Amino acid sequence: MIWNKIEHCFGLKKMLKSNEYLEYLGEEIMDTFSEWTEVKYPIYVPSKARSTVKLTTKALDDAELNYLVVIEPQDVDDYKKEYPSEKLLVMDKNDMGIAYVRNYCKQHSKDNFHWCIDDNIKDFKVRENDKNVTKPTRNVLGAAERYIKDFDNIGAVSLSHHMFAFAKNSHVSVNKQVYSCALINNDLDIWYRNDCVEDTDYSMQILTKGYCTILYNKLLMNKAATGQYKGGNTDTVYAGDGRLKRSQGLQKHWPGSFKIVKKKERWHIAPSRVWDKFTQMPKGPHINLNKNTLQFE
């Protein structure tokens, strides 16, 4: 067990800083990466109007992982041409927005957590020897689940976009935004809101309620560029002034926390330091990192 290895390495009387523990845990999981083949929690892949774009689902099929493609009633016929019926979860309504879809997945899942993964992820990688190396999907998701197994205050975790991996040296970043390939805690009474940048808003809701988020810096997703494929959010949420309105909605919910900027003719939320104000750390029945040190009992 990883806990026993850490305890043996540092000794019973060794005081260990919180971030040191998280890094050591990350190193142990990466060193034993091939062992993490169990993906315990259900996987949902929301998809809209692009039944033939099989990126995420191919990666999951190749790994022989079960999943549900979450679709709207108006798309059923198209998706049935590409997927067996048992892999389709048909929502009740059409064109209700991203928040409705994500909340539908959360309500449908009966486990403690569920995966919600965008449909345009080509493959999964790890950061290894300063390179992004493609790895089995099953192991990447399994390692992500294992990392939080001993904690009970995690609201959500996510993989990082592979393009950002070069800039991060640590295994994880605590209390940052989660997005695109996220493992969501179903036990929290927190819901996505449709009038804003939903992933940012959901992460902020988690943190303001005192829970933690974890962004994996060495477990990565190779995600297609926004707009590369028709359908999805490209033709709805981001169309026209949709991007600007969602950014303004985020400002409404979190006054003073986010600034809107325009880059390459598109509106964006500028990088914010708001995340730095959340100082809570992961904890569990035998682990509490909130005093910046950990003493094994």
Regions found by a protein language model. Name each.
Residues 13-42, 50-51, 194, 200-297:
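C-terminal catalytic/acceptor-binding lobe
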Residues 24-32, 43-64, 75-82:
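Short, well-formed alpha-helical segments that are part of the catalytic scaffolds
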Residues 72-115, 122-133:
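Active-site-proximal specificity loops/subdomain of glycosyltransferases
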Residues 50, 120-122, 162-165, 220-221:
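Short, solvent-exposed loop/turn segments at secondary-structure junctions
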Residues 124-208:
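Conserved catalytic core of nucleotide-sugar-dependent glycosyltransferases
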Residues 37-42, 60-69, 85-87:
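Short loop->beta transition adjacent to catalytic acidic/histidine clusters or analogous donor-positioning motifs
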Residues 69, 113-118, 155-160, 213-217, ...:
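A structural signal for short, well-ordered beta-strand segments and their strand-loop junctions
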